[in-house]
Amino acid sequence: MATPHINAEMGDFADVVLMPGDPLRAKHIAETFLEDVREVNNVRGMLGFTGTYKGRKISVMGHGMGIPSCSIYTKELITDFGVKKIIRVGSCGAVRADVKLRDVVIGMGACTDSKVNRLRFKDHDFAAIADFDMVRNAVDAAKALGVEARVGNIFSADLFYTPDPSMFDVMEKYGILGVEMEAAGIYGVAAEFGAKALTICTVSDHIRTHEQTTAAERQTTFNDMIKIALESVLLGDKE
């Protein structure tokens, strides 16, 4: 039945949901890549859709910006609508010279300055990691598509406008591939409620060089990332 934030019924969502931050990007993904699409959520404008990809039922829904927002939607999808796998498909900022604009990054793990996982893990450090099989399937899908994807640690920041830019130097030293705002929270929610999760990002801006993509491009042109996510779902079904 409907929750305070999702006006859908059990069965409206597939067991796998792709989740961009922007609900308009969710709409674009559904209309571009899925067939037999129907809208399954529109509460607060957080659009959700279900359709099929090569005959496989898949859903896509926005999760908003930041860990608090994405945690609400992912928790409700898992506990109230039976979702088993969540793939965040979003953007990130690069801090390393060898990571370029529009590179695809697969978040094997997610560091964070947020305290949410310490709250759920009795004030201990929780290793926020993606599901191994989902990572492997995404890597295999990228190779099959001829897309060079980077795999490693990303950083989920609570603040978009950071007061301490020297932290980017630390991130670079520790090999962080990209900075975003949600993955660590999604991985924590998935672990808490027995689901699986993965984050795939496209580099939308470079924090060092100040290169950036436009908002319109972020909404519509990060197609390699979406294809990797969708094809990885099909590979997962073969296991």
Curated annotation (Swiss-Prot):
EC number assigned by the record: 2.4.2.1
Alphabetically ordered keywords of this record: Glycosyltransferase, Transferase
Binding-site positions, phosphate: 21, 25, 44, 88-91
Catalyses which reaction(s): a purine D-ribonucleoside + phosphate = a purine nucleobase + alpha-D-ribose 1-phosphate; a purine 2'-deoxy-D-ribonucleoside + phosphate = a purine nucleobase + 2-deoxy-alpha-D-ribose 1-phosphate
GO molecular function: purine-nucleoside phosphorylase activity
Any one cellular-component term (Gene Ontology): cytosol
Binding site for a purine D-ribonucleoside: 5, 180-182, 204-205
Active-site residue numbers: 205 (proton donor)
Annotated positions for site Important for catalytic activity: 218
A GO biological process held by the record: purine nucleoside catabolic process
Subunit structure: Homohexamer; trimer of homodimers.
Family in the record: Belongs to the PNP/UDP phosphorylase family.
Function according to Swiss-Prot or TrEMBL: Catalyzes the reversible phosphorolytic breakdown of the N-glycosidic bond in the beta-(deoxy)ribonucleoside molecules, with the formation of the corresponding free purine bases and pentose-1-phosphate.
PANTHER family linked: PURINE NUCLEOSIDE PHOSPHORYLASE DEOD-TYPE, URIDINE PHOSPHORYLASE
Name of the protein described by the UniProt record: Purine nucleoside phosphorylase DeoD-type
